Amino acid sequence: MKTRIFLALLPLLAAACSTDPVSYFPAKGAAGVNPDTHLVLTFPSAPALGEAGFIRIFDARTGACVDSLDLSLPAGLTESRTYGPECDYAAVPYDYSRDFIPTNKNTLPGTPSGTAEPTPRDMQLTIIGGFTDGFRFHPVIIHNNVATIYPHNNLLEYGRDYYVTIDPGVLVCEGFRGVKKGAWKFSTKAKGPADTRHLTVAADGSGDFNTVQGALDAVPDFCKDTTWITVAAGDYEEIVYARNKTNVVISGAGMDATKVHYANNEVFNPHPLLVKTNEWPGTFPSRRAAFALDNCDDIVLRDLCIATDLYGQAEGLLLHGERIGLYRVRIIGSGDALQANGTIYMQDSELIGDGDTILGRGTLFALHSKFYNHGGPFSWVRNVKPAHGDVFVECHFEGLPGRPADYGRTNKNGRTTYPDAEFVVIDCTTRHFNPLGWSAIGEKSATMLECGTRDADTGQPADVSQRHKYSRQLDPKRDAALIAQYKNPAWVLAGWTPSQSF
């Protein structure tokens, strides 16, 4: 009798032992998957990332391997590298023109652009947004019991069937021994969105795209029509880099609801060994930001949070373009948390970072916005006349207790000085603030103006008696005409009148 009971239980025991403890996204057998999907595995407990093995994606019809991630390659650099005296700014402006958009499918990652040398392929490398030099990236990111796999961008296509294999040891968790051929299959949507001017992004796959980058990749270069990209509430952990995009509105569900972020900085994605970046117009593009709009004009970002997850020279948002508007956007970075090049309008937004919170050679007009740092200068403004620098109207600046902040510095940077630097503050409030106002003004010719500043706690006029000798307090009556000009965005932003009700 006991033998019969035991034999009857054998099929149940076998089924229990063969049950996969992991859930998959896209689900096994899923159809209608967006080609820009990440691959997500949810384990019963926190997995560990192995140091070797492969994750591969195959075309189920042809058997061809369409993508391969080698876990033996490190994600990127973890220590700053040393640059020699031969590293300098390019002698010719960077060329943004292109006859086609390079991707991982048609171009070898690491192919140099501009005057750069080839990017070494001894670490993870992927082309994002057509930047052929490539970005270092994490092939797998683990948070708690969720492992997210990042295929190389733009390799999956519409109307295809795929299966995924994961070597044993790539992800280590009790009961998980990898994924074998044919066990994890899915098929992509037959074709892209019918309405190419109104695109939706949702991390759960319910939109036209799973990623912000996927939606931006779908926008043609220099498109004259407006493209509206709506990003659903959710967490979007990805590097976003777009170039040559125009007339795009990217809308989230609110700065507390839609977050786009990545662990990126100058160490992880440094500039080339022989080419400097950031300082001059036409310089080699930077790859260190979590979110970058490069050579992009007439863009609106609204109702979202953009952040980097690393410290150092680490932009949350890097902007290079004309007429870029930020509305109800929270930007989180470290040093150079916001890099602003071009003409930028910022309203009802927040910026959180470390010293030199704002870097840039462009013009920034900020209205009703809040700026927080962990002590030190809020800016290292580098504008050159006739362009204006940074202007703040009815904004708030705040440091930390015992670590006061200041408006900024314009001190010498190597051989470079900033005689045209401009930083103007009108009717703003401060808290935990350096009585000098500006920690360093390198040139007497710099335009450092202030009017109507109040203490955020008392509401009383701020004590400006110790302000830097090269700064000037504007008189509301005597300087009324100049104050009115600085409060006019069009006067500051080279004739552009941004909407104040976006």
Residues covered by each model-derived region:
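Acidic, low-complexity Ser/Thr/Gly/Pro-rich repeat segments typical of extracellular/periplasmic
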Residues: T19-P193
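Short, linear, compositionally biased motifs with a strong N-terminal bias
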Residues: L10-L12
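Sequence-level preference for short, compositionally simple segments enriched
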Residues: K189-S206, N210-F502
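C-terminal motif of bacterial Sec signal peptides marking the signal peptidase cleavage site
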Residues: A14-A16
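Sec-dependent signal peptide recognition
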Residues: K2-A8
